[in-house]
């Protein structure tokens, strides 16, 4: 049946004649004539017209990808190679001799922009999240992080339990692992314009973490061995350690969870001392009496200066955290979620420690919750600035700033805090258990960021 239909239609197709063409029969010269007609006049090209052709082909920019062996030549260099001056006119024959030069520059991709340059100069590249996704996911993550400031009141009854100290030690080690790894795997490479799917830097970043972990492991093992060797000798810790920690305030509270040890008032005034005693006594009151006390509150004049210093510094810290989150979400939802996870792991022990300090400085529990949450809300302000800066300017500088901040917090702030929290276990003969908890937290944080970076191409968010 199809053959019969085809044989019936064949005579009509032959009668219709050949398919109309747009002009002359197609030949090799047709392509050359088409170029000369579209870019030139009278089947010839002037130098500005030839320059326009090179710009459309992205050839002749001079100074392209330095990784390629072939050099990206400027248009003036290409013209000089063919003895062309500013007043020259290229006819069909001259353009045929010029074509191999264009073909060589295109084939070697010498003038192709590097991924880092494209990432920095094309902020509206395809694949970036929409403004609704950026603001929506950003506010969601910041809200979850800010709620960590309210968890402090829930753990107050457990602060004298042994499990609290071990949980706090694990959380601090987890924060170090996630912050350090997030800076190595995502923030710093993003600042340089690297892509984990194209640039093989993940293994190199893992080696950097390996060097850090190797020295940490060696130092801890050597200390445990030397302590066992000299356990009957002199003590390495002075007798006034607790007094020194009382003056410093922060590490003592995180280590012992002891709200009975108060920070001395700044001027020794009776009102400050009375306010501090009330802050401690409220922890030992029965449930109903404590509730009535919360409703009274404490006069702001009775609150120590340390509380206001902690609130202001924590607000600035949270602002920079929000800045990093906002800039990350402008790049991709995945990048923003990864940065938020690292900050969340750091915020839980940090906000818990701040809550204890505010109580010891003379605040009531409602006041400590309010000001701790108020400083946490500064993260929203940083988020807005980060989104606006990342949407209209290059976010590489924000990633560089956040990467340096994460490294400082992890190594200079959280790491000594982890050592202070584990000091009691080390002095009490439980150094090995504390060492294992530290290892579990560090390696867990590292593994989370490594897996997120390695499988970033398979994880679809937004």
Curated annotation (Swiss-Prot):
Pfam families: Zip. One of its GO terms (biological process) is iron ion transmembrane transport. GO terms for molecular function: cadmium ion transmembrane transporter activity; iron ion transmembrane transporter activity; manganese ion transmembrane transporter activity; monoatomic anion:monoatomic cation symporter activity; zinc ion transmembrane transporter activity. Residues 1-16 form the signal peptide. Residues 241-251, 269-279 have a biased composition (Basic and acidic residues). A motif (HHHGHXHX-motif) lies at residues 230-237. It is a multi-pass membrane protein. It is found in: Cell membrane; Apical cell membrane; Basolateral cell membrane; Early endosome membrane. It catalyses: Zn(2+)(out) + 2 hydrogencarbonate(out) = Zn(2+)(in) + 2 hydrogencarbonate(in); Mn(2+)(out) + 2 hydrogencarbonate(out) = Mn(2+)(in) + 2 hydrogencarbonate(in); Fe(2+)(out) + 2 hydrogencarbonate(out) = Fe(2+)(in) + 2 hydrogencarbonate(in); Cd(2+)(out) + 2 hydrogencarbonate(out) = Cd(2+)(in) + 2 hydrogencarbonate(in). Residues 235-285 are annotated as: Disordered. A motif (XEXPHE-motif) lies at residues 346-351. Residues 17-138, 189-201, 344-367, 418-431 are extracellular. Residues 160-167, 223-322, 389-396, 453-462 are cytoplasmic. The chain crosses the membrane at residues 139-159, 168-188, 202-222, 323-343, 368-388, 397-417, 432-452. Glycans are attached at residues 42, 68, 83, 119. GO terms for cellular component: apical plasma membrane; basolateral plasma membrane; early endosome membrane; late endosome membrane; lysosomal membrane; plasma membrane. Homotrimer. Belongs to the ZIP transporter (TC 2.A.5) family. PANTHER family: METAL CATION SYMPORTER ZIP14, SOLUTE CARRIER FAMILY 39. This is Metal cation symporter ZIP14. It comes from Xenopus tropicalis.
């Amino acid at each position: 049946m199809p053959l019969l239909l085809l044989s019936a239609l064949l005579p009509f197709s032959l009668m219709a004649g050949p398919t109309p063409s747009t002009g002359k029969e197609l030949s090799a010269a047709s392509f050359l004539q088409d170029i000369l007609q579209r870019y030139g006049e009278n089947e010839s090209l002037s130098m500005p017209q030839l320059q326009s052709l090179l710009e459309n082909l992205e050839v002749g920019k001079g100074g392209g990808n330095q990784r390629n062996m072939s050099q990206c030549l400027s248009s003036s260099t290409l013209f000089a190679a063919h003895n062309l001056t500013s007043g020259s006119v290229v006819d069909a024959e001259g353009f045929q001799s010029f074509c191999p030069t264009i073909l060589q520059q295109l084939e070697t991709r010498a003038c192709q922009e590097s991924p880092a340059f494209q990432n920095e100069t094309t902020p509206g590249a395809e694949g970036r999240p929409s403004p609704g996704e950026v603001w929506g996911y950003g506010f969601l993550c910041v809200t979850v992080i800010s709620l960590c400031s309210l968890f402090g009141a829930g753990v107050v009854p457990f602060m004298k339990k042994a499990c609290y100290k071990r949980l706090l030690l694990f959380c601090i080690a987890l924060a170090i692992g996630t912050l350090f790894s997030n800076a190595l795997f995502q923030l710093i490479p993003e600042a340089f314009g690297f892509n984990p799917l194209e640039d093989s830097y993940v293994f190199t970043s893992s080696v950097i973490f390996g060097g850090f972990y190797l020295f940490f492991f060696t130092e801890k093992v050597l200390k445990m061995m030397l302590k066992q060797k000299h356990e009957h000798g002199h003590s390495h810790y002075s007798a006034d350690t607790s007094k020194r920690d009382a003056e410093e305030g922060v590490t003592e509270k995180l280590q012992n969870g002891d709200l009975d040890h108060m920070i001395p008032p700044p001027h020794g005034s009776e009102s400050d001392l009375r306010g501090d005693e009330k802050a401690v006594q409220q922890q030992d009151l029965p449930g109903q009496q404590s509730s009535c006390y919360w409703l009274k509150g404490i006069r702001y004049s009775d609150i120590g200066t340390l509380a206001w210093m902690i609130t202001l510094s924590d607000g600035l810290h949270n602002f920079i955290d929000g800045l990093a989150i906002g800039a990350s979400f402008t790049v991709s939802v995945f990048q923003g979620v990864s940065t938020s996870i690292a900050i969340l792991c750091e915020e839980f022990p940090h906000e818990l420690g701040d809550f204890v300090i505010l109580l010891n400085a003379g605040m009531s529990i409602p006041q400590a919750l309010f000001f701790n949450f108020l400083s946490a809300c500064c993260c929203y302000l940083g988020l807005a600035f980060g989104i606006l800066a990342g949407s209209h300017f290059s976010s590489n500088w924000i990633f560089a700033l956040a990467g340096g901040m994460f490294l400082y917090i992890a190594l200079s702030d959280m790491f000594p805090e982890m050592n202070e929290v584990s000091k009691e276990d080390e002095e009490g003969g439980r150094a090995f258990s504390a060492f294992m908890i530290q290892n579990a937290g560090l390696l867990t944080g590292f593994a989370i960021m490594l897996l997120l970076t390695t499988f970033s191409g398979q994880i679809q968010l937004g």
